């Protein structure tokens, strides 16, 4: 196993050990770079800015360095959602790379906005190109910002990108064979498939559809249908495409949930987008709902608001129908069903009469059609009883009275199917399985009528039925009529859809039939295989002599496997236990043949009964459970299709009255003949501009109403989506990390505030002492070297003086000192020096000289951190004392290395930070000369109060220091190494 880890070495001292080493080693970070990245991780703004400024001057660190996880400082700031650090890093022009993609994936809206505004788009309004690092990038080249934002479904980020003018590649059709698709698939089929999946995943984003689509419903319908078709082609990504299709369907349903009134619902469901402004269109035909049924948007159709509108139209004449007792409902339906001939005759004579308009209502139309079909089934039952048939031996019997009564219904069914195919088209007609069943049923009735006519014309003599030919027309007609009766009775199942209890069962039955068809393919293969083998084995043992009955249907079964057809029958009926085992025996003493035949027969029964039949049961159970889990949606969708068939204008009269030509039909027929067949065709009267204008205005008004409703729905949907996201978010690991980052940043801010408040108090005390020394010049000359040392003390000898913030505030508010420093009013000259600080500090060593343009941009919107303010106050105090020393001639640069007139110092803090205790500060003073600009680094120690200095001299055990030089300064003593 060791050879998998390292190259085998014979001289290895420990052969029972596996030495490990880093095979793919990366470049190590310097301590400064580690500190820089650590500061970014902790959110230390001052330290990060200091590192960036030093990097611009001394080039000690690489500001684009990468940590072991492959993250730059910018990516770390994005992960921590630290917008201040992101803005700081971008101001120093760090490498952006794919930071925008990382910000989008983390859904940091502020970071995305900063990155989008970092580089202004040039030329077209596009997002600046992202420079992807092929070595470390986590994103493939086809992932663009808008695609990734759509994957995250973040509405705010998508809106920012769309406002920048981004675009998404248009995917080709499912079975596109263009040069681009073929070449891309040949070069790299995986990349081609993944790229198309990423594009469709972006297009299926609900936020993107709601934000960029003029008609979100139509976009969701078409996209879900296209994704469903694509799942059948791209079998490798079938589950992904099906999930995206369900996502689009759910989006359309959720968007419809936001409707608040029947007016909004009617505007949406009646909107038609395939008409121009000047074409006449109906405003109450539920065009959008028909489109949803065409694209099989079950969630949209079964939505409660949509179903409520359909129910109100279905029970138009019976507003309180659902609240009535079930007995009242049954009696009402029975009375209307009995009166359907009266309603039909009234509609034929006067279509606009009250009774004629009454039968046009969808619910009344449904009851009348159901009553008509039940009457047809009753006639079929009478025909099967042969009540009026006496001459059973007549070869060509004439039609009976019942058969004459059945004929109008058959003609009415055929005429209704022809009209349905003409109105809806052949493609829509064959997509409905009930229409295929009607086609088979009507074909059987037509064949029966034709054969009966042939038998009546050709055969008229009486002849015993036993002597008739097997293919006699009457016998074939009777067989076809019996099969047609079965289909007619089963056709009644389609009406179960209207009932909430029987509807789900009817849908489950239809799904189980599909499972049975799938099962039959496998079963037929097994059946044919064993039938071929058994027939080959028993073909030589066929018995023909002395048998009055041959086959398995005899009283004593024989010759079960003599022919292929008999073998197939025997194997099929053996599933139901109707075949005896002795059929595998032969008369000859061939025990081996008997054993092989019995073994084959038993193996077939095991496979067919134990394996295949149980597999069929499992498949049917799965189909039923699938329907049961979505019973409400499946049933409402099927019921809606049934209701919509009765909402149409045509097909008002039930059979057999639909074959009777009405006056309206005769008028339409004469008009059509006059228009198309006569020589003098009717010239269509041209429409006036006023009529066209009014029609265009109505269509435009409908379009504006639809867009207004869509705007309101999208706003409500986005608000509900954001509320739901906030509710379901909860406490996650990301929230804990963000909380830790905020606490860390707040800690450094508090430390900076404490440091800045203390130093500002000391600076005010120094200003007061310098003012008093200027008023009493003679007194200051007489005090000697002790006083000179106190005057020459620099603020850069300080590291940190912890004073309670409340005490400082109290001293400033009441003009009182808390014992640490004097608080006096600042002279006007000192204020003027601070105002002119930028001009005085322009040659200071650690400050980077900016260009005029950058300076102008910074002055336009200056943001100072706490560390910047401390440095500025320190430099101002040092400059003030140096000017005083220069005017009095007291500046000296002796052994103590106190800064001179031509030297400025900045205190570099190297104090070790701890979260629990604030330890002793140890700093370095960095001095820069104005002339030679050389840097001198001297060690400094804290300023120790005078009353504590004596104690510290005695306690040398605590601090092991070398001989020191002590300088007294009022209440404090500075100890120098």
Swiss-Prot record:
It catalyses: Na(+)(in) = Na(+)(out); Li(+)(in) = Li(+)(out); Cs(+)(in) = Cs(+)(out). Disulfide bonds join 549-554. Residues 223-260 form a coiled coil. Residues 325-359 dip into the membrane without crossing it. Homotetramer. Heterotetramer with TRPC1 and/or TRPC5. Forms a heteromeric ion channel with TRPC1, with a 1:3 TRPC1:TRPC4 stoichiometry. Interacts with TRPC4AP. Isoform alpha but not isoform beta interacts with ITPR1, ITPR2 and ITPR3. Interacts with NHERF1. Interacts with MX1 and RNF24. Interacts (via CIRB domain) with SESTD1 (via the spectrin 1 repeat) and SPTBN5 (via C-terminus). Interacts with CDH5 and CTNNB1. Interacts (via protein 4.1-binding domain) with EPB41L2. Interacts with PLSCR1. Residues 767-790 are annotated as: Disordered. Residues 975-977 are annotated as: PDZ-binding domain. Ca(2+) binds at residues 417, 420, 435, 438. Residues 776-787 have a biased composition (Basic and acidic residues). One of its GO terms (molecular function) is inositol 1,4,5 trisphosphate binding. Residues 1-324, 360-362, 419-432, 499-511, 621-977 are cytoplasmic. ANK repeats lie at residues 29-60, 71-93, 96-118, 141-165. Signal peptide: none annotated. The gene is Trpc4. One of its GO terms (biological process) is gamma-aminobutyric acid secretion. InterPro entries: Ankyrin_rpt, Ankyrin_rpt-contain_sf, Ion_trans_dom, TRP_dom, TRPC4_channel, TRPC_channel. SMART domains: ANK, TRP_2. One of its GO terms (cellular component) is basolateral plasma membrane. This is Short transient receptor potential channel 4. Zn(2+) binds at residues 172, 176, 178, 181.
